[in-house]
A protein has these predicted regions:
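Bacterial N-terminal signal peptides that target proteins for export
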Residues: 1-10
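Short, Gly/Pro- and small/polar-rich lid/capping loops
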Residues: 38-52
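Noncatalytic, helix-rich "gating/capping" subdomain that lines the substrate-entry/channel surface
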Residues: 100-377
Length: 689
């Protein structure tokens, strides 16, 4: 995936000091003054790449990154306390600041209500009324059977009460269904008290787990019996009745068997099975309980929200909780405002906030423009696959089918679920806000059940807390979808007024994400996003040739000195960065061919055509204009003091110098010849996609 450098982010002005260049290096050809202008099209956009950033003393064939960015590197100081700076570092306002300035009435209402209501205030009275009404409407008190008690609990959850079952979207046979698991006392009650969570289970989503281990799907069991399926165990039957009460068909809801509990018995931190806490959750909603005890268990969950009504109810709840759990006052605290903001933003408001961003920042015309660009790149990619000389027809067929099925999530979802967009205009209290958020989530789940994986991919991502404010573009192999966030659609990342060369060089990002579907990881998944043994390869020979070419890329990138002056002899990491390097190489080649097609269609010829071609490579190098030192290299490339380990991307210099020498046209355009440090003989140039 691409990487550049939780509520909201945006950069809208060009980096300070960037001006339209009056000329380029002597090696870059100018349009002939004797050639009639009408013989060639002219670039109507602005060429704002600053010539003063270049270092003309550097031979392009020795270090193209420094040839394009060397003077900027020399003249730029890394800010104190930082290890990295690029041309967008000091751009103001930032992406987050721009988004934070949007008109978001629901969010403002919620932020206003985060302060606990005074006892007896209008807000406290409204919150208490809602709290009481939900219980009355649920039918819990009138329930005559245990099953009806649990269905009443489900109805309460559909109205916004803290649920006893957590439902997540997932996919079976390519269609959206739901995964259900119990809320755990230890995961829910204590975090609510100490201000760290709002009843959100502290575990990865099932979709994340399935991407880590595709075999997980074989251990999913439906809550309603189907022909040939295993029977629902007694300890999961309560889930069935709860989801029925919420308005879901149990045939669309699954749970995990005990496989993962057994598999991870030696790793207590990883347990994907239906877990029980120290008070034995199996007994909390067990059908073996009497109706009275089962109602009491439901009321316990209902009571978890009581503390959100006012200061008085908060204190009463804290006192009761401490007494039941034998805690001292120092061991618990009231829910903090910042914690509530963070959790709500990530888990309940992301869909609502995404709609605000879409409406106010990404016009439909912009989304449509980029969808056309994506289709343009898809066409080029398909042509390249068909012309591929090392793949068999069977592998080509699989690759083409996967490319054709690939979904382009650009800017925002194609369709919005209005019932999933809360309206807090009449809300007067925090608990009303929370109930509204939870109800909206249930409505969204109902709306996407039965949709195809590709249809629902963007919505599911937003449900799982992926914000549209993310400064990224990503490929998700599980969905076979690329997602282009608004950051990459707006200035300074994209500007329709700038040169065609800059915009097409920038489209490399999109080609990069497409190519991720065919890198060492993505190629293991089929057109539907399902993991397949053997991946897209129709023969072992095709896979072996792919691996051979990938190995050449590892060796090539591993030949670069990361910082020759500061870290002599230290080479770049080629193996860890391989998937990203494959995507970089494929992305730039796809964007380049699309650009050439555009230049030809627009009528560029002669010296003007050559100049436009050169500008594409200059713009690509400018995309990676940055400065960094040893601390950044140690942290970024080698994972020193970085909890997640080395970054999977190459350093900026290698994303230029490691990629472009594999492109034949680059040599002629910049006079690169044998003996230059970056020169690769034609037979040694690496082409994969």
């Amino acid at each position: 995936m691409m990487k550049r450098s939780n509520l909201w982010m945006l950069a809208t002005i060009l980096a300070c000091g960037l001006v339209m260049a009056s000329c380029l290096d002597e090696q870059i050809d100018k349009p002939s003054t004797t050639e009639p202008e009408q013989t060639s099209a002219k670039d109507p956009g602005k060429w704002w790449i600053n010539e003063n950033n270049m270092d003309k003393t550097v031979n392009p064939g020795d270090n193209f990154f420094m040839y394009c960015n060397g003077s900027w590197w020399k003249n730029t100081t890394i800010p104190q306390g930082k290890n990295y700076v690029d041309q967008f570092t000091n751009v103001k306002p930032t992406f987050q600041e721009r988004i934070g300035s949007l008109d978001n009435p629901n969010l403002q209402t919620f932020l206003t209500h985060l302060k606990w209501a005074d006892d007896g205030s209008e807000a406290a009275i409204a919150g208490q009324r809602l709290y009481d009404d939900v219980l009355a409407q649920s039918g819990l008190n009138e329930a005559k059977t245990k099953e009806d008690v649990l269905r009443a609990f489900g109805r309460m959850a559909a109205m916004g009460v803290c649920p006893g079952a957590w439902l997540e979207p997932m996919f079976i046979d390519g269609k959206v269904c739901l995964y259900a698991k119990y809320y755990l006392e230890e995961e829910m009650v204590e975090p609510v008290i100490d201000g760290l969570d709002l009843a959100i289970p502290d575990q990865p989503s099932l979709l994340q787990m399935m991407q880590d281990d595709p075999s997980l799907q074989s251990h999913l069991v439906p809550l309603a019996g189907r022909s040939g399926t295993r029977a629902v165990p007694d300890d999961c039957l309560p889930l069935r009745y709860i989801v029925e009460g919420m308005g879901f068909d149990p045939k669309d809801v699954y749970f995990l068997d005990d496989y993962y509990k057994k598999k991870n018995v030696q790793n207590e931190s990883i347990d994907y099975s239906v877990k029980r806490d120290k008070r034995d959750y199996n007994e909390t909603f067990s059908l073996a309980l009497s109706i009275e005890k089962l109602k009491k268990a439901v009321l316990h969950y209902y009571g978890l929200d009581y503390g959100f009504i006012s200061q008085k109810t908060r204190a009463a709840y804290d006192e009761q909780y401490m007494k039941e759990n034998e805690l001292s006052p120092s061991e618990t605290s009231k829910v903090g405002m910042k914690a509530l903001v963070a959790v709500m933003a990530l888990n309940y408001t992301s869909y609502m906030n995404a709609k605000v961003v879409a409406d106010q920042m990404v016009p439909k015309s912009l989304k449509e423009e980029y969808l056309k660009y994506c289709e343009e790149l898809r066409t080029v990619f398909a042509q390249r696959i068909k012309a591929n000389e090392w793949m068999s027809e069977g592998s080509k067929k699989n690759a083409l089918e996967k490319l054709e099925a690939m979904v382009f999530n650009v800017g925002y979802p194609d369709k919005w679920v209005e019932e999933a967009l809360p309206d807090l205009s009449k809300s007067k209290s925090l608990i009303e806000d929370i109930y509204s958020f939870r109800k909206s989530r249930v409505n969204l789940l109902k709306a996407i059940i039965g949709k195809t994986r590709q249809e629902a991919s963007f919505t599911v991502m937003l449900m799982n807390g992926l914000p549209l404010s993310k400064e990224n573009a990503e490929y998700f192999s599980f969905y076979n979808a690329i997602t282009i966030f608004p950051y990459y659609l707006l200035p300074p990342r994209h500007d329709p007024a700038q040169s065609l060369a800059i915009n097409y060089a920038y489209l490399y990002v999109f080609g990069h994400e497409m190519t991720h579907g065919f890198d060492t990881n993505g190629s293991q998944y089929d057109k539907n996003g399902d993991y397949r043994e053997g991946g897209i390869w129709a023969s072992e020979a095709d896979k072996a040739e792919f691996d051979r070419r990938a190995g050449l890329l590892v060796k090539w990138f591993g030949s670069f000195d990361v910082l020759p002056d500061e870290m002599p002899g230290v080479k770049a990491e080629g193996k860890v960065t391989l998937p990203e390097n494959i995507a970089d190489l494929g992305g730039i080649e796809i964007a380049w061919q699309a650009y050439i097609n555009r230049l030809q269609a627009d009528g560029y010829t002669g010296q003007e055509l050559k100049l436009m071609k050169q500008r594409f490579f200059l713009a690509y190098a400018n995309e990676w204009c940055a400065k960094y030192g040893q601390k950044h290299v140690d942290y970024f490339s080698f994972g020193k003091e970085r909890s997640e380990g080395p970054d999977p991307h190459s350093l900026n210099k290698e994303r230029v110098n490691g990629i472009l020498p594999n492109m034949d046209d680059w040599y002629d355009l910049f006079g690169v010849k044998p003996g230059d440090k970056l020169y690769l003989a034609p037979a040694d140039r690496i082409h994969i996609w």
